[in-house]
Each structure stands twice: as structure tokens, then as C-alpha cells.
């Protein structure tokens, strides 16, 4: 709402909401999911991937766990570099660990050091700096991701964040 103090994450900078525009008309407040333009009372570093919050404390992490579906013809190996698209943020990242592969016929967790096309696994991913994220179950937009191969620019995997609790800021 106009007059509220908000925080831009991940920078932590605060400002007061001076004006809200909804469909080019001034409004006193905005609601979740509404496309809006917000004018602040001072200049704040806000760019694609930043999250504006009021009162809540969003999670930030540079490491997280995600359940991914491997879609690339080239097998996945630990240490592979990607561009990670998470929420509205695009950031370099690396797959650091495969906790287990999920057998799609039995649901069994199977030890794995790589993945082939159409296999699903729980993996650990590290990005180059802390980003705002949440589990998919808690916040769909901040919990879904795509992994893009940095050489071929092809979509290699899609997935959902399953665990940030170990890495909370």
C-alpha cells in the first residue's frame, strides 16, 4: 500500500512506497499476482529477479536442493555448469551433488553419479551469489527452475526447489 516501507531483496535496501499504478491508474494498494508499477520515495537497486517484500522475511540461498527432470540427450554429470532460471532470476550455477535418482517404476531412491534423458533425481545446486527462493510447495514462482546448458543454450532440465532450510540466510 502507499506509505508502506518495503525491502528490496537480495540487497536489503528499504524505501517507502510513494505511488502505485495498476493498469496506468493510481491505486492505494496492490495484491498478490497483480501487474503493477511502483514508485518509491528514493532510488533503490531493483532489477530483474529482485523481490520486494513488506514485513515477511524471504529466503535467500546460494545452495539448495531441487528435484529435476533431465531432458538433455547428453547425460548429466556432477560438476556441470548451467544458467539457472529460478523465479525471475537468471544466474550461473553448478550441479554439485546427486543425492539419488528416482526409479520411475517403483519410486525407489537409487544411488547415482549421473542422469540420462528422462531420469528424475534429487540434486544439490550452487549458484554464484545468494538469490531469493523458496520451496515449490510454499511459493510456486520462487520454487520452479530451468537449467540451461551454457554452451549449447539448450534447456537441459526443469525442476522444483525442495529444500532451502539447510542453507537459509
Label the model's feature ranges.
Residues 1-169:
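C-terminal effector/interaction modules appended to NTPase cores
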Amino acid at each position: 500500500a502507499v506509505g508502506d516501507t518495503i525491502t528490496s531483496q537480495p540487497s536489503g535496501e528499504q524505501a517507502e512506497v510513494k505511488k502505485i499504478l495498476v493498469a496506468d491508474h493510481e491505486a492505494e494498494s496492490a495484491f498478490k499476482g497483480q501487474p503493477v508499477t511502483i514508485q518509491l520515495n528514493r532510488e533503490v537497486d531493483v532489477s530483474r529477479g529482485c523481490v520486494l517484500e513488506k514485513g515477511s522475511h524471504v529466503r535467500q540461498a546460494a545452495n539448495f536442493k531441487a528435484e529435476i527432470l533431465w531432458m538433455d540427450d547428453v547425460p548429466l554429470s556432477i560438476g556441470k555448469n548451467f544458467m539457472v532460471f529460478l523465479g525471475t532470476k537468471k544466474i550461473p550455477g553448478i550441479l554439485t551433488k546427486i543425492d539419488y535418482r528416482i526409479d520411475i517404476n517403483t519410486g525407489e531412491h537409487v544411488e547415482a553419479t549421473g542422469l540420462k534423458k528422462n531420469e528424475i533425481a534429487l540434486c544439490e545446486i550452487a549458484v554464484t551469489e545468494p538469490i531469493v527462493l523458496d520451496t515449490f510447495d510454499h511459493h510456486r514462482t520462487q520454487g520452479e527452475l530451468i537449467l540451461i546448458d551454457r554452451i549449447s543454450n539448450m534447456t537441459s532440465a526443469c525442476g522444483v526447489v525442495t529444500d532451502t532450510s539447510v542453507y537459509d540466510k
